[in-house]
Amino acid sequence: MTDTAAQRHHRLQAHADLLTQTLRGIEKEGLRVDHQGVLARTAHPAGLGAALTNAHVTTDYSEALLELITGTHTEVDSLLGELRDTHRYVYGVLEGEYIWNQSMPATLPPEADIPIAWYGTSNTGMLKHVYRRGLAERYGKTMQCIAGVHYNFSLPDALWDVLVPDAPTPQARRSRGYISLIRNFTRYSWLLMYLFGSAPALAREFMRGRDHLLETLDPSTLYLPYATSLRMSDLGYQNKAQSRLKLCYNDLDTFLGRLYEAVTEPWPAYQAIGTRRDGQWIQLNTNVLQIENEYYSSIRPKRATGRCERPITALAERGVQYVEVRCLDIDPLTPEGISAETARFVDAFLLFCATSDSPFFPDNGYCQRSADNFAVVVKEGRKPGLMLDREGQAVSVPQWGHELLDQIAPYAALYDQALGGDAYAAALAAQRAKLDQPDLTPSARVLAALREGNVSFHDYSLDLSRRHADALRAQPLPAERTQAYAEAARQSVAEQLRLEQSDAVDFDTYVAHYHAALKNPLPSTAS
């Protein structure tokens, strides 16, 4: 007997209290810039501890690209409260610098002068640093300075028992459920880009030396008039090696098998670069992907890993633990880069994706139609009359969007039922208005501010970042919270030193061990 979305929703309704155990966490990136909005060339501030080992504040690609990390929370308000507190602590440490509250970068120095993140001399730290050197060789440093908000989301095992009752084990139910969620996310994530895309413009110099079809808004600003998120377009992420990757989202085994091929298959252009230059490591290997995290996607199945454990192996042996949504732009109008309204809508959207019917993609497990819909929305999602392809039928953005919101509404209602109040319904209602009035979308609001203020992308973004900084600094943390962050920073420095002093093998051997830790996932029984 076929298990339908209506039946799953009915079962979910009977167990709505389990939704109080939904966990969500945020990783929010942001470039450090000086008072002129130029990328900071300073080292990671000592008051933030060691980027390698601080659980609250680390760095992403560049030494200047902060990543603020929350713990997991069962409520959106406490989640954003922690993110706000971390921002406030960081601003208590930064001297003469701001966090650039835009996804597209600030003024960048010449490519060679963009500093790669440094994590100390331990083998673990050097692995992270050399991986980033490899990214510079493969994609250039400029692209790596793009920032975003990553939203981590998980449902309790007891809820997967309700939603996927026919799988044989808790691990199988969980993994099958998350992969089903990812397929639906792939189908419908164009809607997130329309509603929350906030990057329709960028600084002209970001495109230095590259061909593009962007239009000129002012002498220093490029844009597309109906774009929602140039960050998620192909502007910066053009790469022949990755473009041929078509990972399968029909089942976890096949997904991991294809990812395994990518991290073990040599790529001629990278072989030509080699792994060393002048005796220094410049990339971890010459394969299509150095490591799993190099694969660029709008959502990832995730599993926490131990030291030196490979993500593929962890997923194959223990299954999917949560999903990481990677397509959200920084909200430039919000000091924390994401609003509670956005977070609640994403919760309801992901629950809808987990519960809705999720047919398999074609035999190769990749849906070109969904990729095409996503690509057109990020570049011209607000274009009047724009049509998308829904199962071979043309449909307008407002029509399909409203139909999706109608389908998501019952899941927003379930969260309100479980948590009390009507915050989820209100979050959904705000998105309906954006479908009816495209000028209400954040991408349209950014362009309107640039035009009406007769101001460049750079000056607008710097002014916003300054104002957010002033607002956060005007609300200093309570002494005990400041002390807790400071103690975590001190402990992270001690932990980095311990790692540096405890390495028992040289870096070459460590890299060999790291590669050897990767197991072929195909014999796995996880499904």
From Swiss-Prot:
Pathway: Sulfur metabolism; glutathione biosynthesis; glutathione from L-cysteine and L-glutamate: step 1/2
Coiled coil ranges: none
EC number(s) given by UniProt: 6.3.2.2
GO terms under cellular component: cytosol
Cited InterPro entries: Gln_synth/guanido_kin_cat_dom, Glu_cys_ligase, Glut_cys_ligase
Keywords carried by this UniProt record: ATP-binding, Glutathione biosynthesis, Ligase, Nucleotide-binding
Gene3D superfamilies per the UniProt record, alphabetical: 3.30.590.20
Reactions listed under catalytic activity: L-cysteine + L-glutamate + ATP = gamma-L-glutamyl-L-cysteine + ADP + phosphate + H(+)
Highest taxon of the lineage: Bacteria
MF (Gene Ontology): ATP binding; glutamate-cysteine ligase activity; metal ion binding
SUPFAM superfamilies hit by this protein: Glutamine synthetase/guanido kinase
GO biological process: one example: glutathione biosynthetic process
HAMAP family, alphabetized: Glu_cys_ligase
PANTHER family: GLUTAMATE--CYSTEINE LIGASE (PTHR38761:SF1)
NCBIfam families referenced in this protein's UniProt entry, alphabetically: glu_cys_ligase (TIGR01434)
Similarity annotation: Belongs to the glutamate--cysteine ligase type 1 family. Type 1 subfamily.
Protein name: Glutamate--cysteine ligase
Native organism: Bordetella parapertussis (strain 12822 / ATCC BAA-587 / NCTC 13253)
Lineage of the organism: Bacteria, Pseudomonadati, Pseudomonadota, Betaproteobacteria, Burkholderiales
Protein's gene: gshA
